[in-house]
Regions:
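A residue-level detector for short acidic-glycine micro-motifs
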Residues: 11-14, 31, 45
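N-terminal alpha-helical targeting/anchoring segments
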Residues: 37-45
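Conserved Radical SAM active-site core
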Residues: 62, 71-165
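N-terminal functional module detector in eukaryotic proteins
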Residues: 24, 38, 53-54, 90
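PDZ/PDZ-like groove recognition
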Residues: 1-13
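PDZ-domain C-terminal substructure recognizer with occasional recognition of PDZ-binding tails
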Residues: 44-78
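Conserved PDZ fold ligand-binding element
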Residues: 18-38
Length: 165
């Protein structure tokens, strides 16, 4: 696993299982029970098993930790936010492009990220999904995902979205 994989820990709750085990902020979770972890969704999905064998990267070292969690209790681990996948469409109606200048920066983020849809209810057109993303959505039962449908006619859809997909 390279340095660009994993989910970085932002905070450890004092007195938690993670705190007692020696896991620390800045550690990067590489896997849980042999399953690769890339973001918050992977972490939540795989951390529900009760017994967690975690592989963590700390600087240039790989460390193993074993946690036992009770059902309904969290591990005490808070992850840093993942990098949002941005939109590559050139929609003729894009509200982000129509915003006035001078608003807060976060309003100008054109996200097209199914993870944001699942976690926060953002709408997506699904034009940038990879085969791996589709597989993950099914395997992890990521629902609901809010889909922005503007036309079911493929030619019209491509024209409206400004995207050949």
């Amino acid at each position: 696993m390279d340095k660009n994989t994993g989910a970085e820990i932002e905070e450890i709750r004092p007195g938690s299982q993670a705190d007692a085990s020696g896991i620390a902020p800045g550690d990067v979770i590489l896997s849980i029970n042999g399953h690769k972890v890339n973001d918050t969704i992977d972490f939540m999905f795989f951390a529900g098993d009760g017994f967690l064998d975690m592989l963590v990267r700390r600087k240039d070292k790989r460390l193993s930790f074993r946690l036992q969690t009770e059902e309904g209790k969290d591990t005490g681990i808070a992850l840093k936010p993942f990098k949002i996948k941005t939109c590559t469409n050139k929609c003729i109606f894009c509200f982000v492009g129509q915003l006035p200048k001078g608003l807060r920066r976060t309003l100008y983020i054109k996200d097209e990220d199914y993870r944001m849809s699942f976690l926060y209810g953002n709408y997506v057109t699904l034009t940038n999904l990879s085969p791996q993303d589709k597989k993950r959505i099914v395997e992890q039962r990521l629902s609901p995902i809010y889909i922005s449908v503007h036309s079911t006619n493929n030619a019209v859809r491509k024209m409206i979205l400004g995207n050949s997909k």
